[in-house]
Amino acid sequence: MASSILRSKIIQKPYQLFHYYFLSEKAPGSTVSDLNFDTNIQTSLRKLKHHHWTVGEIFHYGFLVSILFFVFVVFPASFFIKLPIILAFATCFLIPLTSQFFLPALPVFTWLALYFTCAKIPQEWKPAITVKVLPAMETILYGDNLSNVLATITTGVLDILAWLPYGIIHFSFPFVLAAIIFLFGPPTALRSFGFAFGYMNLLGVLIQMAFPAAPPWYKNLHGLEPANYSMHGSPGGLGRIDKLLGVDMYTTGFSNSSIIFGAFPSLHSGCCIMEVLFLCWLFPRFKFVWVTYASWLWWSTMYLTHHYFVDLIGGAMLSLTVFEFTKYKYLPKNKEGLFCRWSYTEIEKIDIQEIDPLSYNYIPINSNDNESRLYTRVYQESQVSPPSRAETPEAFEMSNFSRSRQSSKTQVPLSNLTNNDQVPGINEEDEEEEGDEISSSTPSVFEDEPQGSTYAASSATSVDDLDSKRN
C-alpha cells in the first residue's frame, strides 16, 4: 500500500520537479547540504559527551535555560502537564533527525514561552506603567503624534490595506521566509535565521517587561491617566476589521493579550525589519520591494494606533543590532550564481580581518586603485618585523555556478599585477636576488593563501614617486 502511494503521480511528479530544479545542483561527493536522518539518541549523547564548550555556547544555552526555568516555575500549570512537555522537547533535542531543526530554534521557543507567561507573572513583580514618555518623545523627536495624524482619516479600503500586513502577513511570513532560506540560502543559513529571529523577539519581550509603555490606543481611550495591569487591552483599528468581516478575530485576543502595555519596542517592526534584512541578504536585487514592504507595515502599525513611530525605530534598531551580530558571527556567505543550498560545495563565513581597513589582512575592494594599493603595501610592510620579502600571490575569487546551468567553475583574478608590472621603487638587483624565491607561475586556487603574505615595497616608496615614474 505504501509503495503504491509513493509510486503514484501525486508523489512522483513533485519529486521529479524537485530533483530537476534542486537536487540536480548537488556536486558529486558533496555532503555539505545533506540532512541528518539518524534517529539514534546515542549519537547525540556521544557528541555531547565529547563536545568542548566555548564561552559563547555556555552563555547562550545558560541564558536560554535560565529563562525556561523561570517560565517553568512561574507558569501556573500542573507539574504533570509541564513535565511531559519538557520530556517531549528533550527528546526532539536528542534525536539527530529533529535536533538539527529544534536546537537552532531554541531562542524562538524560549521567546514564545516567556511571552505567554508574562500575563501570569505577579503584578507586584512588574514595574510601573509609563503613559507619558512615548507621546512626549514622539512630539520632541518628530514634532507631532504621527500615529494620530495617520489615523485621522479612516476608510474601509485603508482598513483592509493596513490589516493585511499587520494581521495576516506578520504572523505567516516568518514560516514562508524560513522555507525560502532553507531552499535558496546556503547550508546553515536557516540556523542563523532562527538564532536572529528568536533573540530579537526574546530581547524585545524582556525590554517590554522592564519598560512597560502604553500604546497610542490607550491615549485615545483614557488620555494620560495612570494605567494599571488590571486594565484590558484594545484591538485599536483592528476592531473595525472584526466589524467589517463579522468575525471576532482580534478583539478578544488583543483585549486579553499577554503583554498589553508592550508598545516599546515594536516587535511588529522588529520582525519585519529582520525579515527584510535576510531578504536583502538573500535576494539583494529586490531591495526596493523589501523596503516597500517594511514601509507598508510601518504605516499600518501607526494607522491602526498600535505603535508610535519611536516604537518602530526602537524595534528596527534592535533587529539591526541582532542581525549584524549574527551576520559576522554565524551567517554564511551568500554566493552569487548559486541557485540553491544543494549548489554549495563549501560553507564560507565573513572574515572580519579582510574587511577591516585597519587590519593587517585587509584587501582593498578596488584593486586597480594604485594609490590605495600602494598605501596598503607600505602599511603592511611597516607592521612586519622580519626583513625578508614575502611572496606576492595573486588574489583569486572562486565564482561557482550551478552545474545544470554551467558545468565548469571560472576563476576571476582580482589583481592585474604581473612580473612585468612591478611597483616603482624596487631595484632590478633586488629582483635578481629574489628570483630564486618568487615563482612566476600562478598559484593554485585550491591552495590556501598565506596569511602573512604581503606586497613587497620599499619604505621610501610614495605616491609622488609613482607619479614621477609614470611621467
Curated annotation (Swiss-Prot):
Gene Ontology terms describing biological process: mannosyl diphosphorylinositol ceramide metabolic process; sphingolipid biosynthetic process; sphingolipid metabolic process
Activity modulation: Inhibited by aureobasidin A (AbA), khafrefungin and rustmicin.
GO molecular function, one term: inositol phosphoceramide synthase activity
Topological domain ranges for the Cytoplasmic compartment: 1-54, 99-100, 190-191, 280-281, 326-471
Subcellular location: Golgi apparatus, Golgi stack membrane
Protein EC: 2.-.-.-
Domain of life: Eukaryota
Lumenal membrane side: 76-77, 122-168, 213-258, 303-304
Biased composition, class Polar residues, residue ranges: 399-422, 451-462
InterPro entries listed in its UniProt record: Aur1/Ipt1, IPC_Synthase-Related, P_Acid_Pase_2/haloperoxidase
CDD domains tied to this protein: PAP2_Aur1_like (cd03386)
GO terms under cellular component: Golgi cisterna membrane; inositol phosphoceramide synthase complex
Residues passing through the membrane, by range: 55-75, 78-98, 101-121, 169-189, 192-212, 259-279, 282-302, 305-325
Descriptive protein name: Inositol phosphorylceramide synthase
